[in-house]
């Protein structure tokens, strides 16, 4: 009986230790500020810029039908769609490395459609990140890395493919309206 209690105690300590070790550093945007989550109320939107084209183009979505969309790398002159981030598993106000978040592209879509994209985070260098697609927010399995694929001249994102890194930039609606096209 004492051995099983000791094992239970050691398991509990190990789980707490793993939780502390897995608690990541904050993800930062292009200004060096922590990326803010949507916890209700006012929260900033961001654009996600691809390192492959010098952080000039953003990510956007391409709709196949009413609710199915693909994420793609927009051309250099297109800043992409604004994105908000949320996580049901945290009350932390900022995104942290190694945690899972829903990326919600801000766009007009039918109300029956879910525009959230589940993603995991890992870092390569300060302010530049790799994305990982997760099948669910609370699964215990590792999330595969997101890469890029060239399909008919358009760069789509998916599992595997070419190495793909990004950075986050605060979305400025005024700059989007006045930017030369």
Curated annotation (Swiss-Prot):
Belongs to the protease inhibitor I3 (leguminous Kunitz-type inhibitor) family. The record marks 100-101 as: Reactive bond. Possesses two reactive sites. Inhibits an equimolar amount of trypsin and chymotrypsin simultaneously, and inhibits kallikrein weakly. Its main location: secreted. It is found in: Secreted. GO terms for molecular function: serine-type endopeptidase inhibitor activity. Gene3D superfamilies: 2.80.10.50. Residues 1-24 form the signal peptide. Pfam families: Kunitz_legume (PF00197). SUPFAM superfamilies: STI-like. The keyword Protein biosynthesis does not apply. Disulfide bonds join 67-113, 134-143, 136-139. The lineage of its organism: Eukaryota, Viridiplantae, Streptophyta, Embryophyta, Tracheophyta. One of its GO terms (cellular component) is extracellular region. InterPro entries: Kunitz_inhibitor_STI-like_sf (IPR011065), Prot_inh_API-A/B (IPR016308), Prot_inh_Kunz-lg (IPR002160). The keyword Disulfide bond applies. This is Proteinase inhibitor A. The record marks 68-69 as: Reactive bond for trypsin. Keywords: Disulfide bond, Protease inhibitor, Secreted, Serine protease inhibitor, Signal.
